[in-house]
Amino acid sequence: MTSFSRILCVIDPTETEQPALARATWLAKRTGAALDLLICYYNEYLGGEWYSDSTSLQKTRADVLEGLRERLEILANPLRADGLVVATTAVWYHPMHQGVARQAIALKSDVVFKDTHHHSALSRSFFTNS
């Protein structure tokens, strides 16, 4: 089996089931790699592009990220109890694929796991999905 030292797993905050996490955990257990859980989040209404980037918007973004970090910790704690080394990160970034790529480079990840979702042809023609 290929040697991995760091695995990045992108968590979808809109879903309860996390198939990518199951696959990343499986690989981390077999290779002894550290596991990084990442939520890369953005909300256009809190982004500050439509309105001025006020102190209240900044606080709201910080609160949202803190809630996402807490969710990541809930996912990470059972994995740590199983002996895995798990780190958690929630970042505010748009577009998501660039945020994931930047985190993968910064963390020196050997492999990235992310769930996929089916989108209809009509949806794909009008929207950019990540």
Kindly give the residue locations of the regions a language model identified.
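Small/aliphatic-rich secondary-structure junction motif
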Residues: 1-56, 80, 87
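Structural beta-alpha unit
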Residues: 1-2, 77-112, 119
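Structural motif corresponding to alpha-helix initiation and N-cap regions
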Residues: 18, 94-98, 128
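Generic structural signal for helix capping and beta-alpha/helix-loop junctions
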Residues: 45-47, 96, 121
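Short, hinge-like loop/turn segments at secondary-structure boundaries
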Residues: 53-56, 105-107, 130
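A short acidic, glycine-rich active-site loop
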Residues: 55-70
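Glycine-rich, Arg-bearing micro-motifs that act as flexible, cationic patches
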Residues: 111-130
